[in-house]
């Protein structure tokens, strides 16, 4: 099985790479990032592509001589990091959608998208609305299987700040994990999201998924992660 991973230097994406590297079922891993990742040359089955201009990513994906069986994306940003609502949508929706479309056109059969708890195209909140619109439009691309993961507060060490809101959510998530309060933020370790993402990727290629579209919310994501640990 071959995989293509977008957002591989982020909190969740880097964990997806780690799990993929350790999986004997995965024979090749391709990542596309803006800068040289820390894991470059960490595995013989890993190929890293670099392009600082993310608007060119879809063309790079389409130019790959051999398509990847599975396209996984944990790519995303925040309004604070993007600088404006317009830039946020251009990056979080635009780059994600064009890259997924390119992967589908290049022959990928399964798409695993790491989205967010509360994603809804009808939401009055920019972040949730954009995530929901992205989900809806990626589903319309018609992969053999589209798996959408909606984690709650992500736990783990970030290399870059994603803004005060994310920092607060992560701190509270750490405090509430394992208590009755965890139902509010549904905290989950990024490494566990990585495990679930790769598990779904493998099941999709192996013919073990019955549904064409699978959406996994925070509670179910935690349960699935626990079953894999």
Curated annotation (Swiss-Prot):
The keyword Mitochondrion applies. One of its GO terms (biological process) is import into nucleus. It comes from the Eukaryota. The keyword Transit peptide applies. It is found in: Mitochondrion outer membrane. It holds the Pfam family HIM1. Keywords: Membrane, Mitochondrion, Mitochondrion outer membrane, Transit peptide. It comes from Candida albicans (strain SC5314 / ATCC MYA-2876) (Yeast). Residues 1-36 form a transit peptide. Belongs to the FMP52 family. This is Protein FMP52, mitochondrial. One of its GO terms (cellular component) is cytoplasm. It is a peripheral membrane protein.
